[in-house]
């Protein structure tokens, strides 16, 4: 191995960005095939390649950061900037969905009956499952902060407990959201209301699944003693992401469920 005289990580060539992009193409094309032709082959193939890519890419990052020591303070600083920029890009993603919702709801067209919700749409009661979902996500925000503080204080047992509770709450939220979708009287094809509702809440639901997976990886890593009180950027990034998901849900709840109904 050559001697390195700088603090930066020269990343080796990796196939995972390419396989990840291909899996994303398969999943999006597969969703179109599933929605229009009721064929699940492509979307399942996309999910499989995505899971395989995710596993191997995460394995490489863990190997580089934990076992090879490539994640120096300078590299960690760069990773932090990267995560912040990624979350900002996600904010703009959701801004587009909120824009579509408010554009349609603040000045409803005659085709919608000149009112919001549109004529014939029976919105979900914001005081039932959506309120429970809000409580679940707010509680998970508390438990992830508890996990972070426990890690900083070197309390491994409490960190694992808090992280497990957070992941469980994330899974519970996903199940509640799935049951809500199943029971909704309208679908994604029911005009602009159905489109904006399912696109915004569905995209948020996808982020909850991604965040839960991220936290589950952190849980497994903590079981193997990968984190210390001063070297745990993987967990820190997951916690930031989870707080972002929390905040987006509050905006969704107030805008789409409460005001929009």
Swiss-Prot record:
This is Cytochrome c oxidase subunit 3. Component of the cytochrome c oxidase (complex IV, CIV), a multisubunit enzyme composed of 14 subunits. The complex is composed of a catalytic core of 3 subunits MT-CO1, MT-CO2 and MT-CO3, encoded in the mitochondrial DNA, and 11 supernumerary subunits COX4I, COX5A, COX5B, COX6A, COX6B, COX6C, COX7A, COX7B, COX7C, COX8 and NDUFA4, which are encoded in the nuclear genome. Belongs to the cytochrome c oxidase subunit 3 family. Keywords: Membrane, Mitochondrion, Mitochondrion inner membrane, Translocase, Transmembrane, Transmembrane helix. Its EC number is 7.1.1.9. It catalyses: 4 Fe(II)-[cytochrome c] + O2 + 8 H(+)(in) = 4 Fe(III)-[cytochrome c] + 2 H2O + 4 H(+)(out). Component of the cytochrome c oxidase, the last enzyme in the mitochondrial electron transport chain which drives oxidative phosphorylation. The respiratory chain contains 3 multisubunit complexes succinate dehydrogenase (complex II, CII), ubiquinol-cytochrome c oxidoreductase (cytochrome b-c1 complex, complex III, CIII) and cytochrome c oxidase (complex IV, CIV), that cooperate to transfer electrons derived from NADH and succinate to molecular oxygen, creating an electrochemical gradient over the inner membrane that drives transmembrane transport and the ATP synthase. Residues 35-40, 106-128, 184-190, 257-261 are mitochondrial intermembrane. The gene is MT-CO3. The chain crosses the membrane at residues 16-34, 41-66, 73-105, 129-152, 156-183, 191-223, 233-256. It is found in: Mitochondrion inner membrane. PANTHER family: CYTOCHROME C OXIDASE SUBUNIT 3 (PTHR11403:SF7), CYTOCHROME C OXIDASE SUBUNIT III (PTHR11403). GO terms for molecular function: cytochrome-c oxidase activity. Its main location: mitochondrion. InterPro entries: Cyt_c/ubiquinol_Oxase_su3 (IPR024791), Cyt_c_oxase_su3_dom (IPR033945), Cyt_c_oxidase-like_su3 (IPR000298), Cyt_c_oxidase_su3-like_sf (IPR035973), Cyt_c_oxidase_su3_a-hlx (IPR013833). It is a multi-pass membrane protein. Residues 1-15, 67-72, 153-155, 224-232 are mitochondrial matrix. PROSITE patterns: COX3. GO terms for biological process: mitochondrial electron transport, cytochrome c to oxygen; respiratory chain complex IV assembly. One of its GO terms (cellular component) is respiratory chain complex IV.
């Amino acid at each position: 191995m050559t001697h390195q005289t700088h603090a930066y990580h020269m990343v080796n060539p990796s196939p995972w960005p390419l396989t990840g992009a291909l899996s994303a193409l398969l999943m999006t094309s597969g969703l179109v095939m599933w929605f229009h032709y009721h064929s699940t082959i492509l979307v399942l193939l996309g999910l499989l390649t995505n899971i395989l890519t995710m596993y191997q890419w995460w394995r490489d990052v863990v190997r580089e950061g934990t076992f090879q020591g490539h994640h120096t303070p300078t590299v960690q600083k760069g990773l932090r900037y990267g995560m912040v920029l990624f979350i900002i890009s996600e904010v703009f993603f959701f801004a587009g969905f909120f824009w579509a919702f408010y554009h349609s709801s603040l000045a409803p067209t005659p085709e919608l009956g000149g009112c919001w919700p549109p004529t014939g749409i029976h919105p979900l009661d914001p005081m039932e499952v959506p309120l429970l979902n809000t409580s679940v996500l707010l509680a998970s925000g508390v438990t992830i902060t508890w996990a972070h503080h426990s890690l900083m204080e070197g309390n491994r047992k409490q960190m694992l407990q808090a992280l497990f509770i957070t992941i469980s709450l994330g899974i519970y939220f996903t199940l509640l959201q799935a049951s809500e979708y199943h029971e909704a009287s309208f679908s994604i094809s029911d005009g602009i209301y159905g489109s904006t509702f399912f696109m915004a809440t569905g995209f948020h639901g996808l982020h909850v699944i991604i965040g839960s997976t991220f936290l589950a990886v952190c849980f497994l890593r903590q079981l193997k003693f990968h984190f210390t009180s001063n070297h745990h950027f993987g967990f820190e990034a997951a916690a930031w992401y989870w707080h972002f998901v929390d905040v987006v849900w509050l905006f969704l709840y107030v805008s789409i469920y409460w005001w929009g109904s």
